[in-house]
Swiss-Prot record:
Species lineage: Bacteria, Pseudomonadati, Pseudomonadota, Gammaproteobacteria, Alteromonadales
Protein purpose: Nucleotidase that shows phosphatase activity on nucleoside 5'-monophosphates.
Entry EC no(s): 3.1.3.5
Protein name (database record): 5'-nucleotidase SurE
Any one Pfam family match given in the protein's UniProt record, by short name: SurE
Keywords: Cytoplasm, Hydrolase, Metal-binding, Nucleotide-binding
Gene3D superfamilies (UniProt xref): Survival protein SurE-like phosphatase/nucleotidase (3.40.1210.10)
Family, per entry: Belongs to the SurE nucleotidase family.
Cofactor note (record): Binds 1 divalent metal cation per subunit.
Record GO terms (molecular function): 3'-nucleotidase activity; 5'-nucleotidase activity; exopolyphosphatase activity; metal ion binding; nucleotide binding
GO cellular component entries: cytoplasm
Length: 249
């Protein structure tokens, strides 16, 4: 049976990772390794100045006092009994679309899996109430099975966003590009109980590019979006432009 490594950024006790693990154990041997706390927004950060401590839980999951990227790196390099066939991250409580992907620990966990040489998928549930993790879990299993039967090029990560709808209300799957958001809203300034000044980052901006073909548009219209992402951040179309600029300075 195939081996799948599951991780997330919401933490080892989050309902999304439980739904994902339970869906995938029907088709694979699953190892679940996730942060011991919520690490939303951790992006691709690694812990380099402190040791990583683990805790083996009664349900078989392993919690790590580290980031999502730490979890995947540690699991593949040390904790897994043999290499996984795939890394699946999620199910995130909240969408990871457009610019969100730059900050997302969910996407970063998948990216670390891909960076280490394995097919990788990130899956997130759009919405505010998060009632339908099972819908996302069904699509996660379907897409993972599809990857096993029909492998894709190994240089991509599949970023999946699922509308928070009952399964029978989801219209299907659309292949999308990343949309874009407006700038995040302002900083919230307040004081702690001792009267010291503290700051909270404001909520993300509203959609700026949610046109047809984007992940925002697909999910808003009841479809699951799948966006291929790459680890290589090179802006290839700008190479010749940059070379011309360098030649002038």
């Amino acid at each position: 049976m195939i081996r799948i490594l599951v991780s997330n950024d919401d933490g080892v006790n989050a309902p999304g990772i439980k739904a994902l693990t339970e869906a995938l154990v029907e088709i694979a041997n699953v190892m679940t390794v996730a942060p011991d706390r919520n690490c939303s927004g951790a992006s691709n950060s690694l812990t380099l100045t402190n040791p990583l401590r683990i805790n083996r839980l009664d349900n078989g999951y392993i919690s790590v006092h580290g980031t999502p990227t730490d979890c995947v790196h540690l699991a593949i390099r040390e904790l897994c009994d043999g290499e996984p066939d795939m890394v699946v991250s999620g199910i995130n409580a909240g969408a990871n679309m457009g610019d969100d992907t730059l900050y997302s620990g969910t996407v970063a966990a998948a990216m670390e899996g891909r960076f280490l040489g394995f097919p990788a998928v990130a899956i997130s549930l759009n919405g505010r109430e998060f009632k339908h993790y099972q819908s996302a879990a069904v699509y996660a299993r379907r897409i993972v099975q599809g990857l096993l039967l029909h492998p894709l090029a190994s240089d991509q990560i599949l970023n999946i966003n699922v509308p928070d709808l009952p399964l029978d209300e989801i219209k299907g799957i659309r292949v999308t590009r990343l949309g874009a958001r407006h700038k995040a809203e302002g900083i919230v300034r307040t004081k702690d109980p001792a009267g010291r000044e503290i700051f909270w980052l404001g909520p993300p901006g509203l959609e700026q590019d949610a046109t047809e073909g984007t992940d925002f548009h697909a999910v808003a219209n009841g479809y699951v979006s799948i966006t291929p992402l790459t680890v290589d951040l090179t802006a290839y179309r700008q190479l010749s432009v940059l070379q011309n600029w360098v030649d002038k300075i």
